[in-house]
């Protein structure tokens, strides 16, 4: 390995030339260190998007003044892998609740375009690992639920009982090319065909209104029902979008250890979106999941599916250079140098931090098993750890990348301690530890829901609460289906609709905001509140969306009462 950071030569961000989980438990780090076109109502919602962008009767200058007066702290709680429908399908006041959607518009199609007669099995089973929840044992195998109708469904046991929110289901594929094929120009009829979990993608929690604390928070404050994930695909690239509104870039990837991950697109696909399928990949969704060849990097070398950071915590470390990953590994992304929201905040002298649950334990080599109830840690959920500005030993790393600790007590959770002490910076990003983030496969909805409630309760008791805005949202849909078509944008997104709840003394109360937002809207709000330089990726997204139908993604002010 060389000490020299590779040069990216990527100063002019150009998202337009082409058509458009791994997880790590703390024990793994220890080893490394030791070694829509939907129904007519939905279409009407799409057409009305431009009518709900501003969300306030105040002039722009009055909004700016009100933001400076009323908001001094922004807190972003970034959860994992749930579509809007999966948790909020029929929340009161939605523009287009699931229950009013014409059944013909949500019918799923096979990979050849024909409509499926039934849904396929849930490949490998809905609950493939035995677990005890509420004193009852759960193990739901592939053969236990079959022949489901081609329709969305409430998640249930084979006996027909509602699946408890505390049960960890199997994971679902959530990746850049898959998501675009699933959305299928807004028809959202390819989720089964291009997923890897069979029928499971169409599931949602039918008892959410009675069981989820997040529903109660949304009832009290503002739920956004047109909030879309910033990028098609998975956690890695959507965490990157949260901090810089663009994917990472790997220069000369074709000459690098990562060259095997460069996508080869199928020349027979007229849209240029489908990677080549492996030999023997099932022809029909009823026979099994589609299997792609490598699809980590785009043909022009943007990293769109999971790569690991150049610095610890990482899966594979450089034994000769403590704190650094092995840069010869094909999964390691070279250090990035383009601007992030952290850079522009620092340039303006605005305090900020990324708090990560389990960060300190991961760096120290703590070890726990890989399942819910244990503090798993995901290296690709730490976006600033991919940038040379935050390399080990730098002042910026020490100041801005903070250990949130673990659990739900101020004794062990350092973010909770800072909240109670009124010591939060102006902008706080919080990434919960893995078993509390709601990610299917290793976390459950109930644990994450409880954790959100604990954090919100603490924030409301903080001395900083009076001038605070909290955004609770998800990185991406986790592969779960949604019926609302994302607005047309640039080659990166927006992707599938996800939940977002705005919590603040200045949020509209008991409100559903129909404004069009994406993950970048969080950056737009921060940029507007502190008068920052707007990141190039935000500008590119706005130009692309406006060129389609005049829609501009909002900046969250539609959720606020600033009068």
Give residue ranges: language-model regions.
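N-terminal pro-sequences and low-complexity stem/linker regions of secreted or lumenal proteins
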Residues: 2-20, 24-563
């Amino acid at each position: 390995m060389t000490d020299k950071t590779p040069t990216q030569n990527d100063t002019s961000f150009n998202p337009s030339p082409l058509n458009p989980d791994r997880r790590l438990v703390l024990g793994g780090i220890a080893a490394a260190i030791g070694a829509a076109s939907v129904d007519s109502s939905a279409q009407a919602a799409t057409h009305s998007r431009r009518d709900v962008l501003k969300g306030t009767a105040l002039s722009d200058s009055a909004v700016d003044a009100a933001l400076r007066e009323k908001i001094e702290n922004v807190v972003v709680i970034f959860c994992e892998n749930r579509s809007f429908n999966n948790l909020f399908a029929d929340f009161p006041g939605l523009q287009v609740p699931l229950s009013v959607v014409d059944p013909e518009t949500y019918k799923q199609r096979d990979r050849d375009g024909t409509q499926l007669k039934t849904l396929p099995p849930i490949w490998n089973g809905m609950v493939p690992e035995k677990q005890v929840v509420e004193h009852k044992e759960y193990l739901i195998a592939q053969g236990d639920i079959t022949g489901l109708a081609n329709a969305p469904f409430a998640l249930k046991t084979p006996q027909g009982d509602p699946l408890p929110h505390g049960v960890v289901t199997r994971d679902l594929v959530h990746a850049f090319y898959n998501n675009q094929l699933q959305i299928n120009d807004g028809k959202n009829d390819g989720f089964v065909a291009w997923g890897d979990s069979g029928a499971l993608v169409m599931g949602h929690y039918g008892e959410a209104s009675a069981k989820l604390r997040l529903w109660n928070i949304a009832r009290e404050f503002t739920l956004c029902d047109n909030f879309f994930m910033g990028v098609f695909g998975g956690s890695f690239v959507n965490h990157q979008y949260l901090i810089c509104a663009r994917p990472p870039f790997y220069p000369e990837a074709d000459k690098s250890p990562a060259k095997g991950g460069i996508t080869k697109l199928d020349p027979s696909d007229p849209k240029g979106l489908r990677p080549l399928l492996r030999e023997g990949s099932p022809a029909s969704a009823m026979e099994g999941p589609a299997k792609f060849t490598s699809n980590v990097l785009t043909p022009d070398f943007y990293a769109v599916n999971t790569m690991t950071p150049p610095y610890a915590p990482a899966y594979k470390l450089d034994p000769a250079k403590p704190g650094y990953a092995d840069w010869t590994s094909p999964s390691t992304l070279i250090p990035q140098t383009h601007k992030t929201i952290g850079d522009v905040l620092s340039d303006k002298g605005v305090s900020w931090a990324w708090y990560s649950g389990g960060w300190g334990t991961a760096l120290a080599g703590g070890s726990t098993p890989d399942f819910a109830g244990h503090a798993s840690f995901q290296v690709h959920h730490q976006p600033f750890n991919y940038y040379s500005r935050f390399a080990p030993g730098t002042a910026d790393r020490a100041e801005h990348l903070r250990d949130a600790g673990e659990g739900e007590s101020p004794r062990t959770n350092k973010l909770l301690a800072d909240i109670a002490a009124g010591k939060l910076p102006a902008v706080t990003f919080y990434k919960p530890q893995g078993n509390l983030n709601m990610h299917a496969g290793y976390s459950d909805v109930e644990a994450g829901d409880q954790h959100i409630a604990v954090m919100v309760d603490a924030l409301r008791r903080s001395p900083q609460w009076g001038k605070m805005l909290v955004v609770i949202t998800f990185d991406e849909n986790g592969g779960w289906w949604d019926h609302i078509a994302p607005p047309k944008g640039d080659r990166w997104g927006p992707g599938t609709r996800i939940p977002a709840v705005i919590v603040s003394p200045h949020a509209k109360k008991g409100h559903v905001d129909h404004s069009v937002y994406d993950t970048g809207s969080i950056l737009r709000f921060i940029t507007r509140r502190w008068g920052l330089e707007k990141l190039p990726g935000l500008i590119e997204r706005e130009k692309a969306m406006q060129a389609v139908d005049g829609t501009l993604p909002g900046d969250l002010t539609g959720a606020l009462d600033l009068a």
